[in-house]
Amino acid sequence: QSKDLNKTCENVINTENIVTNSIEEQATEQIEEKESVPCEEIFDEDLKNAVISFQKTHGLFADGIVGLQTQKFLNKSAKEKIEQIRLNLERMRWLPRNFGDKYILINIPEYRLRMIENNDIKLNMAVVVGERKHPTPIFSDKMSYIVLNPNWNIPESITKKEILPKLLKDPNYLASKGIDIYQGWHKDSEKVETTEVLDTLILQDIDSVPNFRFTQGPSDENPLGRMKFMFPNKHAVYLHDTPAKSLFNNARRAYSHGCIRLSKPEELLSTILDEDKTINSERVNQILSEETEKEKAIGLSKKIPVHIIYLTSFVDENGKLQFREDIYNYDKIQEKLMF
């Protein structure tokens, strides 16, 4: 698949006037032609449609309004775009030669997940990725199990920066969020009373607090939602549901601490269940429907490759050349090394 993608992009980049013939240049040319026209006649329907097409090929909110983000992309020269394509062609060379017959592909700057089987796209959904200071890593691994009604073992960094300060302000904060405290990170660690932690906080600096484990059980407040999809890796990154559905309405979706939030986790689960006959789908639905159910892990009979990539320029499934914001500044870093 990556070989075909490389071939497609090479054919595109060698085509004469690739950028000047594209929709972004059409929009720019129309704007320049109309500069001397009275203001009320400048922005006609044709130009609005050209702007909308331009916004779609750049991952922007397609409203036809030439806002700051749209202006930023319009102001990119043909030379800059060709260099961006070259950077991504080089990046494609680093990808696995064979992604497998069935795999999950996540392109970070596109904020999108696709599940592909025999070159057909089975699923296509919006995702939320890591913010700039907590970037989602680029790597490949294999999904081996799914966790229903997951507990959230809150990372130590989040505990110290967010949870403990809130606990100091409100002693009932943990109870209101369904968060329990344990003596350590072992699964058999003893539970600790909130008062004990508060006493420790009062006597010590937050950074000196012992390594308690803060765990949030299954609930509507749990940031992992009702399910997570695990492909064990050194980055501790996984795919998961989220209660913050409104974020998927945004064009720019870099908000997480590194994990990938799914807009349609139920569809991914359903697709996996349809093809993995070793899993009792009725039991799965029962677990998800009952609020009293505890965390439950379900193994997959066949592991599914997961590839997390970073392409700011690519050809989509419709053969359209796409550009995206360099959200982690990786293009700038690579450009210094290449040019």
Where are these regions (language model features)?
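Well-ordered beta-sheet/strand-loop patches within structured domains
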Residues: 1-61, 68-339
